[in-house]
Amino acid sequence: MKDLLYLKDDQIKEFIQLLYYAYRETFSDSKEVLSKKFFGPAHLRALNLIERNPGINLGELIYDLKVTKQSLNRVLRDLIKSKMIKQIKDENDTRKKNLFLDREGKTFFEIVYNTQKKRIFNALKNSSSDSVIKFKDVLKKIINGK
């Protein structure tokens, strides 16, 4: 059987380290923009999920972020107070509140996104389409635990 060198412990540890550095660098690009609003990484994660999933409800957001309701409430209060997001009662179940980016939030998110986009865009542009597709496939398998 062929020896799979990329499955050895040292290779896996290196891959984990590279994932960390990629995450760190991608999100450090937006740190200055976030700090002007006194926001941190938790605010950005919430904004990102709300932007990508307009109308997401609180339970779904908690599940996707893997945080407690208590920790998310502080972040949401900050975002609502800053007019970044708005809560709208669900038409079918008024106990649920759906979250949307407000106009200010859309503008702010675009600024943050554009700071991160440069790094990702350059990496994708300087890779073959086959590499990008395979990398995306590997990331999805990491996320899904397969």
Model-predicted segments: where are they?
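N-terminal leader segment of winged-helix/HTH proteins
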Residues: 1-37, 84
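C-terminal regulatory/oligomerization modules of transcriptional regulators
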Residues: 1-7, 129-146
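Residue-level marker of regulatory loop/turn positions in helix-turn-helix DNA-binding domains and
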Residues: 11, 39, 50, 101, ...
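Charged, amphipathic alpha-helical coiled-coil/dimerization segments
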Residues: 27, 77-136
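N-terminal helix-turn-helix DNA-binding core of bacterial DNA-binding proteins
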Residues: 28-68
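Short helix-capping/turn signature of helix-turn-helix
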Residues: 50-53, 114, 142
